[in-house]
A protein has these predicted regions:
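Short, hydrophobic beta-strand segments that form beta-sheet elements in well-ordered domains
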Residues: 112-113, 127-133
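Short acidic amphipathic segments
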Residues: 107-111
Length: 197
């Protein structure tokens, strides 16, 4: 395995906090606290990613803040991998909900938000979901086959982008706490454009 692929495999978990705000600059200590990891271990992983030009940094006093350079194609690709990693983690923890989401994701972009995305869901928690596209009877039939309470919002991606720009609270919540399913590329590009400002 090459050095760069080892960096990917061992570091996807430490990049998850960056998905709350793609443009955020974070100290290693801040990420370590949020993930309950040793700061030195995390700093070494971030340094390795930085040396591979996968994340960038700025010096702030004696410390470094790490961030994604959203103008680079590699940042888009890495964010897509991190979003896939989040999806896989979710599916491994919530098997029954995962079956529903896998069915709905065929040919669609989905965003899970709310208590499940924040990892605070309890037994009986409802599923908050955005499906980018039009409401269809096929999707409604899929949802009705499952014993979950599902709150679905059908929204064109262009309207979601517009609501992000105008500061609509639900759109901002979705941008910061989400798990993406299905066709992620367009949603990630929309979030990158929003955070680039």
């Amino acid at each position: 395995m090459t050095n760069i692929s080892q960096n990917f495999a061992n570091s996807l978990d430490i990049l998850v906090p960056f998905t709350r705000d793609y443009a955020k600059e974070m100290h290693a200590s801040e990420i370590a606290r949020s993930l309950n990891l040793p700061q030195r271990t995390l700093a070494r992983k971030l340094e390795a990613l930085q040396k591979s030009n996968l994340v960038n940094y700025k010096r702030v006093g004696k410390n470094k803040t790490f961030f994604f350079d959203l103008t680079l194609l590699s940042s888009f690709s890495l964010l897509e991998m991190v979003e896939c990693y989040k999806e896989i983690l979710f599916l491994s923890k919530h098997l029954q909900v995962g079956l529903l989401l896998n069915e709905l994701a065929v040919g669609h972009s989905l965003v899970l938000f709310g208590s499940y995305a924040k990892q605070r869901a309890k037994e009986g928690s409802d599923i908050d979901l955005v499906i980018f596209g039009r409401k269809s009877t096929k999707l409604q039939e899929i949802i009705s086959r499952y014993p979950f309470e599902v709150n679905v919002h059908y929204v064109p991606l262009s309207l979601f982008e517009k609501r992000l720009k105008t500061g609509w609270p639900l759109a901002k919540e979705i941008a910061s706490d989400h798990v993406l399913f299905g066709e992620k590329g367009k949603v990630i590009k929309s979030l990158i454009n929003y955070y680039k400002k």
